[in-house]
Structure formats: structure tokens, C-alpha cells
Amino acid sequence: MNIKPMLKIRLHFQLRALLLCYVVLCSAITSGAQESKNSFVFPLKNKKFLNVQVCSEQVIRVRLAAKDDFTPTLMEKYGILKTDWNAVKASSKMEIGSRIIQTAGFQFILNEDSGELSIKDAAGKLVIQKVQLFHQESQPLCKVLGQSLEQYFGKEKHGGGIIGDANYTGIKSETDQLGPVPSVLQISLAADERFYGGGSTSRTNIQHRGEALRIWATYQKTEIPMPFLLSSAGWGIFNNTTYLNFFDIGRFQKDKLFVYNTSGEMDFYLMLGNSMSEVIKQYVTITGKPYLMPKWAYGLAFGGNTIENQFDMMNDAVRFREEKIPCELFWIEPQWMAKNYDFSTSKTWNQDKFPGEPFWEVNKMPKYEHPTLFVHKLHLLGYKLALWLCIDHDMTIAAEDAIAVKNEKPQSGQEHWFNHLTNLMDQGVDGFKLDPGRTLDEHPERKYYNGSTDAEMHNLNQVLLPKQMQETFRGHKGIRAFQHYCGGYAGSQHWGASTSGDNGGGKDALYDQLNLGLSGFVNTSADVLEYVTDNKAGMHLGFFLPWVQINSWYSLHHPWFMPPIEKETFRYYAQLRNSLSPYIYSAAIEGSQTGMPIVRAMPLAFPDDRKTDNLIYQYMFGENLMVGVFSDSLYLPKGNWINYWSGEKMEGGKTVHCKIPENRGGLLFVKSGAIIPVLKPMLYIGEHPTDTLVLKVYPEKQSTYTLLEDDGISFDYEKGLTATTKFTCNQKGGQIDFVIGGIEGSYTGMPTNRVYELEIAMKEKPQSAFVNGQISTGWSFTQTNILKLLVNEGNTSKDIRIVIK
């Protein structure tokens, strides 16, 4: 809750008085700065050392220590943060009382008199005016800010367990949350700066100026916090700590950002970019590019009720196909295990409900996918299979042993939890759902194998869990797995997918999707249809998420158990989603390269439009589709937009109110100029070859779209084995020039020829169509003013030019 007005005033004036007498830690620099490869160490008069590492032309790292010994953090040690930075041309010089570190991208200025830091871009423009570092020696600042944060958040509540776990009570106890030796980083803010990111730490805003964020993974509250903030001014900060930390963004003082570390450490990265999207790219370069799931994983995943058995699930699988509702994957909740909630490494199939192997072969090795049992039968129907897991294990054992192997040192000899899952992989399991039980729980009494306590390990555990899961699957199968976990921290985006956990598929989940996207997390989803009062509205949001999860673990979310209108709505959205798979997967590949999310918050997509600063109930789904949720109105940015349901073209720069059709759940608009690749209907991704592609074109002056593709399953994309196809549309007067670019790049299984079916929205019927200068007779014009043109691309490496007159 907010602090009381009188306390706020008292703290404000107390702080102003204290600032006059504070000893800033970096109050003076002695001579003799040490320089090594892209790293500069400055000894300070107070016996501390400041280390500035130039990571790239846009990224610098700043560390403060009592000794000139800047050892790797656990995030580096365990392979979560990038350490293999390329050499950057950087120089250090003295100029009018300041030490200046210069690269082609920025100037880092350290004032010798005040100890303050500032950042300028390559052109000399001031990006960050003032950065000050306060440590435990400056207790008044740390204490006053800490008191204010405790008033704001209240006493921290711990314990209670995870829903479904046998240990779950829901009863939480209050404890103090601020450490005894904090450090504070203070950054001056420009008057009009807005701030985004922080992971899933706010369910009231996506623009965080004026509030504080608590960076600690907490069940059902802040499950994937990210110690990362993104400024609208084109810079960002990553606070490199796994201890409890806070961002106070213009709340305590309107013109200040405070980074409060409970551990006393000070280690942060500053990133510069010409746009917010560039800064996100820098952040995921540091913490890991987003994971690219297998192509099929971007479709619908369905989890049945916990009392279902193999026959119920197989009947569901057949019913989806009969109802012509595309679905990619089934997962099984804990009932697949012989022992419910089995945390051990000796778990076996529940032979009464889900016999994944013949009972007489339980002890037989090696394991294999049995051709007559349910796993193989699912695969024959085109489905994938995932299993629910719960984990309660010290993951530093495997992490430390990996380092020991690399250094040719003895290993621990202790158990690595994930290794036993390889038997299930051999039996045909395609992925895993990682439950938060015990991992999102706190373990204040636990001493980890690496010597750390839970204060340092709790946030880090949220990354090690999906990391070790992915590494195990990849090491054993050599292909991409489907795995997701509702917890996370910095770096989690690199190791798998996420959901909003046990928070349903309503407005809370929406905030999580937007805030995580603004933090470089691409593969987000929710428990679609849970905790929603309007099923159609829940479907509208759910089917326009990066991947779709229907979790019916205690419910009956099967579409055939819905009223007819809802069942038909479900079918429509599932089919639309399936047809959009080339568009969605292309956005996923882009995200894996740049950190650009599939669900794009409006201020990220339209940063120069101040009306989008804190828009919640709408977002861009990829580059060209705008989704409005839980409302019949939305704001259209400047330009022209097409109502997808009605076909009506509308001018932007205003808020519009539109009728939502009875069999739809929200608003959907197409950006004028859009080119959207879709597939013809399939029951699952990969049912038919993708050598025929439909292009939905909405001409508006000149526009382009680039389709990204790869093999959809291997890790070859990491080697650059992807392909791009650029489409260009130029509308001038009554003529449309459309160019299908030749495919650039390659991947295994890439089509050598392709058929394009163009569907071009037009005002009136054209007179003629030409393909590569030859008049075409293979076109028609519909009553809804859509020109349909068939183009057979005999050689995918060559351009095709189409002219419509």
C-alpha cells in the first residue's frame, strides 16, 4: 500500500537533508587507473574499486568492490550471462577533471570531484545525466529508502505452498524483507521519460514511472521478475544480482530512479539504443536470446482433467479431429505417475491410467516408444505428448559438476535430477510442463551444494530449472523440446516458454504477457479460460498469445462441453490460429534473434505516440495485427486500419467503439499495408506440406513484409540456417505492383518450388493482372472485393513481379 501523506512528506524532507551530508561512495578517484582488454579499474580514495567493462559499443558493465578482484557472479559461472564479448575499440582519457571512456557508440564519463557517472551517445547527446552509487557507509539513504519501500509493499508474506502440492496450506507468515547491508544506485530521470520492463512484477501498469517493483520470484504475485528496466529515451539497465532487489521509478523522488539491492552488491549493465526495441536486443544479448520452440509448439496445447485416463485422453484426441478443431499437443497432469506428485528420480508410469510401457517391461532397458500403446497412437494422430513434473532438488549440484567436467576436476558424485527423464524421452515424450511446486517455494534453511543460501539462490533457481531441463532434452534428443515453467528470472527467456501460472487467463494474465514482452520474453501464455467470466473473451485473448494453453486440470474446458455458440467460437479461433502459423512462427524466429516479442505492447510498437504510453487492453500480435481484449473500444494509432470482422476501413489517431460479433470475443484490426502469410486449413501443423502459401494483402502506398522460416525442429537456426522471403507491395493510383522476392538462405527441407495464392483487398474489380510481364487469366474477384490470383513459383530463388491494373 502507499505510504501515508505525512510520512511521505517527512521522508522527503529527511532525504533532502541527508543528501547534503551523504558521503557518496565514489567521491573521489585516485590516479593510476588500470586498463586491460575492454576493462578499466579505478581505485577510489575510500579504498574501494570501480570496474568499468566495455562489453560492446552499446553495453557497459559497472561493478563496485572492496578489492580489485571482480570474480564472476553465479549468473556468469552457470552460463546464463554472456561472457565471450568481442574486443571493442575503447579508449580512456582525462578531460577537465573527468575520466572519459569512449567507444564508437557512447561516452562514459566519471567525474573526479563528485564521483558521479554520466552517459552520452556517440553524437555527444546526454543520455543519462547523473548516476550515483551509495553503499552501506551511506546508511541514511539506504535506511530511509528501505523504510519507504517497506511501507509501500508492506511486510513480505512467505510460505503456504503451491496449489495441488500435498504441502499446500495457503497460510503465509510475515517477515522483514530488507537486508542489513543494502546498496543503492541513483539515476537522474528526464521529465518525460517512461519506463517499461521489470518482468511480471506489476498488474496495474505497463508504464512503471511512479511505482516501485519488487524483484523476487513469488507464487501468484511476481513469478517472473526481471531486474531490467527500459527507458523511452533509448537506454536500459540490468541489475546483475540474484538477491532480493527493488526498482523505485520516480515514486520516492519524481526525478530519480533508485535501484535498491539488499545484498550490498553493486553490479549493473547499462545499454544504449536508438529505440526501445534496440535496448531489448542488447538485454537479451547479455542474458540469452529467447528460445525458439519447435514450430508445432506455437499451436494449441490441451491438458485434460486430472481424473482422466488414457482412454479419456484418446477419445479427446479423436474428438478434436472429428470436430475439425486444430490441436497440436496433449499433456498429462500428475495422474500419469504411479505415485501422485512424485518428486523422486524413480518415478514410473501409472499402469492403471497411463501405461507408457508394458507392465512386464518396466525394468527392461533401453526404453522405446511402444507401437501399440497410447503414446504412439497419439503420434499417429498428429499429436505431441508432454508430461507434468514437480521438482524439489538442489540444482547447483549439476551446475557445479558441469564446471568440474569443463575444468577436468572431480565431480560431486551426487544425483542430477533431470537425467532420469531420458527414459521418458526414449518412450516418445515430446516435452514437459514444469510445475512451480517446491521451486517457487522458498527454502530459508537450505544450504546449497555450492555453499549459497536461498537468499542468493531463490531467484537463480527459477532459471536453472528450465535451463537444466532444456540442456537434458537437447543433449539426449538433439532437437528442440516443448517445456514451460511459470517461474523465471533474468535469462529464463533463453531456456523455454512460460505461462502466467495459477493466475488464470484474464486481466492479471494480460498484464504479465505485456510486461514480460517488454522484458524480452517471447514465449508467454496463460491458463486460457481459467478465472474468466466470459469464455469468448477468454478465447479471444488466449488464441492471440504466443502459444495457447487450455489447462482443464480440474475443469471441463473441452469445447464440446460448451454451449453451441461458444463451441463454434472455439473452433473458429483454433482454425484461424492454425492458418496464421507461418505469420506466428516468423515472428517467433524474429524474437529469437532480437528479443522482439510476438505480443507487442502498444508503446513498444508505437513509441512516438504518447497515447499508447500505458495502454493495456490492446496490443500488436506480430507486426500487422492489433488485438483488443476485454473491451469493445480501442485506440487506433495514426494511419489506416481494417476491422477484421467487418472489413471496414477506419482512420487512425482516435479511439473507436466497434460491435463485437456474437460469435467472437473481442476486436481485431489489420494495419493497412499489411501482408500476412497464412496456410490453408490443417488439423495440425505439418499435416500437409507448406509448399502452398496464401498471402492476404491490404495495399496502402508502399509496404513490405519479410517471412522468416527454418526447419521448425532442429537447432540449425543457431548456425544461421534460416531463410527469408521479402514481399513488397506498392500501390500507386489504380495500379498495384507486388513483388515476391526470391528466398534467401536455406534450411533442411526447404521447398524448391512454391505456389502462392494472393488475396488482395481492392476498392473495385481490376481490368487485368500480369505475372512477370505475362498477362494472367488465373484470377477472380469476389463479392467482398478480394482479388484472388494464383502464382506458381517454379524457382524459389527468383523474384516474381505481379502487376494489377
Predicted regions and their residues:
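Catalytic and substrate-binding clefts that recognize carbohydrates or anionic sugar/phosphate headgroups
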Residues: 92-294, 304-305, 310, 317-322, ...
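Solvent-exposed beta-strand/loop surfaces of large extracellular or lumenal domains
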Residues: 74-90, 643-663, 768-790
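Surface-exposed interaction regions enriched in Ser/Thr/Asp/Glu
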Residues: 792-805
